[in-house]
């Protein structure tokens, strides 16, 4: 064998599980995870996606599973597949995220309920998208018109359910809720009507919702004209009509139902949305219509009764799902390729030859209903694809480490996302099968044996060059086919035909390479707007695409929508002896390094640990710290110099332990390490945060090795040290008295079975400059109400110790909740938190709870005279694009230096303090000034960011709860 080519044969170091069935990457159309619409998140990129590919049956199938009828199956028309990873039974519990991690989704249906009717879910529960209750993403891995040449018939399916940015991996098991009172993360059963029967006549209803008046607009600030990446949609149809279809005698097979209904397109028209029982049409038929069809299997005559049951407004929530399916078809007509859940144009790929990368431009698009009506949300998306196939990566690994080649390959490849360009699908690599090669064969659905070499040659015209390469394994979740059969098995991929996606780790550390990439991906507002204009022009010039929209009476505006927003007043920053109004750039680094902080802690007893070869950098750092300590009002003594003979982990840990044992008054441990060492950093933090609690600061020698930057770096280090010792840097004016602000965020630890780590940070003084922090570890499905009680009660007790009173108002900022979980948070999880107040006699504070959503697609442009530019920091929008269900607003608090202005979405789910919209917006903006790791505004309120840093440190580095001795200091900065 060629010595420069890896020996692919042999036993895998991580032996793959032996499955009975094997699937080819082009065999079965890969549907995405069945998403609970309440989940509001997109699926991971690592699964097969298909766009119009024919189905190839599996080598093995399980028993047929009974499917439910409803919105979940509405893509299944005329042989269109809408399979899912689990049997479509009502009692199966989709995974979701509660306020504190992994719980049950809001789309929970209990077993003690009567069987549900085949109709849409409550529109209030059809929550989707990044911020709107009626949004459904159209870039999803469902097929359009597969198996049917008639593109006018519009089946609907799970893709109609809402998605947002990303889906968390569901836990490995599901639990059925008890009949007892609801607990944390356990939402109510959905209201559904009983299944229709011939003895129960259908009643025609006309949908007309009176919009409840919700005061959500503020008035403070300067008006400003803004552009949005939303396009107004005009509905020309008067209504959408819902019909109930009954087959007599009953026809169990859905595909037969679709076929029989298709035979009567002369009556129903060629624009339909049918799920096997419920039919939606843009035209009005008779109240009751009787049709006849002949079953082809036995020539039996079947009577089809179509009865009108509901007249919907064209902007109804129930219409949003199949409007999105319509727009997916429009994108297909523009020759856009569906990859993952977005559409891309490979023909316009930008090639970075020096970095061996391709960038595919594309769009993420979804239709949603907001306070301003029906909109198309379109965002520019880019797919980064490497020119290196997996086989090239394997060869490179072989050259570097021949002895442990298979180990290194498995370690590097497993978990990565690859794309197969012959069908534009993405897969996650779950394992490597070192015992199979393309010369091996598999069984087709018709029973024929075929080798992988023959399969690719016959189906794609591809000649495989490397015949001895191993095969990559992708294990999709179990799902059903079109006939309810359970699909199992593995998808085997050829490394030669699989291309790596994403940015290589080595490239992420290359400043020049990342700069080149950012120039292509980070578009200015003008470029972003031009890309959206291009999409609208392509749709307008494509007659087929325009006609597809007009079939349902939809027409797009010619340009993005423009509204009026406001710029909130600039805030006053308070230091110890001075205060000042921030500039438009919202940066006050000069002031905080020139004037004393509010509270500084003298640093008299501290130790500096450094390897011998970093002695010069250590002395320069200490000299600079002594120079800059005076201006910020901090007193410091020389450190205890501890020189290390080497930079091994054991040396650092053993030396720090012995020093802490000998010197009992050490306030701060400062360690200088040689380069970015994650293992060493983690060992130091575990020692100083868990085993021997003491504030610690780890400094990379590279950051202090440049004399020109040493002063600015030392200033940041000293400010961080002051925070970790309990100091207070700056504050803002807080008009609300006796206020406690809480930040909560969740980190999911993939290395520990996706257990949730909750970061909890609360203010414990009246000026919001002193913080109390706790961490809660939660396993999947584990109740943590008791743990939360410890956090909240502990923070209230600490507040009382500091102020000699309890807070009158508590404002909670909760990060990481999707739209689909908002009702669960409001109805179940907040009451659980309020029960904590019972620990104090006669104590019922006013409470305000905000859900903070960062992963949104909404972009803001400032409408300048010539073109769009980046909006001013402090820009707020509280109308038109806001939710129909909640009091919410969008706030761009930070200064955007590159790219577009992506605001943060704030949804108020509780307001017993009766704060006005102006108070909510101003308080939120003030808190965005309070993150002491950056002398400027950040994208989210400071307690949210603190909670995120705490949860990440505890879940990713420590894997353990920090010592209680550190809970009153910001040790996690």
Swiss-Prot record:
Q: Name one GO molecular function term.
A: RNA endonuclease activity
Domain Piwi per the UniProt entry, residue ranges: 668-959
| Residues covered by region (Disordered) | 28-65, 162-199
Entries under PROSITE patterns matching the protein: PAZ (PS50821), PIWI (PS50822)
UniProt entry keywords in alphabetical sequence:
Biological rhythms, Cytoplasm, Developmental protein, Differentiation, Endonuclease, Hydrolase, Meiosis, Metal-binding, Methylation, Nuclease, Oogenesis, RNA-binding, RNA-mediated gene silencing, Spermatogenesis, Translation regulation
What family does the database annotate?
Belongs to the argonaute family. Piwi subfamily.
Name the UniProt record assigns to this protein: Piwi-like protein 2
Native species: Homo sapiens (Human)
Q: What is the lineage of its organism?
A: Eukaryota, Metazoa, Chordata, Craniata, Vertebrata
